[in-house]
Amino acid sequence: MASRKEALARRANRVRRQLKSVANGRPRLSVHRSSKNIYVQVIDDAAGKTLASASTLDKDLRGSLKTGADTAAAALVGKLVAERATKAGVKEVVFDRGAFIYHGRIKALAEAAREGGLSF
């Protein structure tokens, strides 16, 4: 039986493999969630560069958040990354949820990014 860490890595790789088949050159909106914070990056895999990023640890958000581990914080991070991505000239992305299910904080971040102007 695979360890928890191996199972998470296998699940994340499976999701990323599916994304690469449908990406068509679009950047990847990669999300990582920890127990206390949430992090998101817009990554151009062809160039190997990060185009925009945001997290609950950003100075723009840190003062206004009670905690980085709730759906309200995830929604603020989603809006912030959408704003930064549009400044960088990115409108369309593919959503990389990694090994996390599309529920709760991940879903709140995705919906806020869509409202902020990103399409996926």
Curated annotation (Swiss-Prot):
In the record, what terms sit under GO molecular function? 5S rRNA binding; structural constituent of ribosome
Pfam families membership: Ribosomal_L18p
| Entries under InterPro entries matching the protein | Ribosomal_uL18_bac-type, Ribosomal_uL18_bac/euk
Q: Name one GO biological process term.
A: translation
| Keywords for this protein | Ribonucleoprotein, Ribosomal protein, RNA-binding, rRNA-binding
A cellular component term, taken from the record's GO annotations:
cytosolic large ribosomal subunit
Q: Which NCBIfam families match?
A: L18_bact (TIGR00060)
Supply the PANTHER family for this chain: 39S RIBOSOMAL PROTEIN L18, MITOCHONDRIAL (PTHR12899), LARGE RIBOSOMAL SUBUNIT PROTEIN UL18M (PTHR12899:SF3)
Q: Which family does it belong to?
A: Belongs to the universal ribosomal protein uL18 family.
Please give the HAMAP family that the UniProt record associates with this protein: Ribosomal_uL18_B
Function description? This is one of the proteins that bind and probably mediate the attachment of the 5S RNA into the large ribosomal subunit, where it forms part of the central protuberance.
Subunit-level organization? Part of the 50S ribosomal subunit; part of the 5S rRNA/L5/L18/L25 subcomplex. Contacts the 5S and 23S rRNAs.
| Name of this chain's protein | Large ribosomal subunit protein uL18
Q: What is the lineage of its organism?
A: Bacteria, Pseudomonadati, Pseudomonadota, Alphaproteobacteria, Hyphomicrobiales
